[in-house]
Curated annotation (Swiss-Prot):
Its main location: membrane. PANTHER family: MEMBRANE PROTEIN INSERTION EFFICIENCY FACTOR-RELATED. Belongs to the UPF0161 family. This is Putative membrane protein insertion efficiency factor. Could be involved in insertion of integral membrane proteins into the membrane. It holds the Pfam family YidD. Transmembrane segments: none annotated.
């Protein structure tokens, strides 16, 4: 099943690259943030996978409007995979 998520993530990133390469130049620069929303989405999907990455990208697109000041808004770091960062209540092996 993990393989399917990788394929979906790569497909989403390929679609974003297509947009960035062929559609975005026709529209001109519109993003108020650095990195741009498409770069943010590609990084978020690569870092967190297609589900959480798409959610982060959708939240970012919701903030990209004329009434928001914009600015530098990087993708959050992935949480550490140590047992101390786990939110579960049970013991770890």
């Amino acid at each position: 099943m993990a393989y399917h998520w990788q394929v979906i993530g790569r497909l989403l990133i390929a679609l974003l690259r297509f947009y960035k390469r062929f559609i975005s130049p026709l529209l001109g620069p519109r993003c108020r943030f650095a990195p741009s929303c498409s770069e943010y989405a590609m990084t978020a999907i690569a870092r967190f996978g297609p589900l959480r990455g798409s959610w982060l990208a959708a939240r970012r697109l919701g903030r990209c409007h004329p009434f928001h000041p914009g600015g530098f808004d990087p993708v959050p770091d992935a949480p550490a995979s140590s047992p101390s960062s786990c939110r579960c209540k049970g013991p770890h092996p």
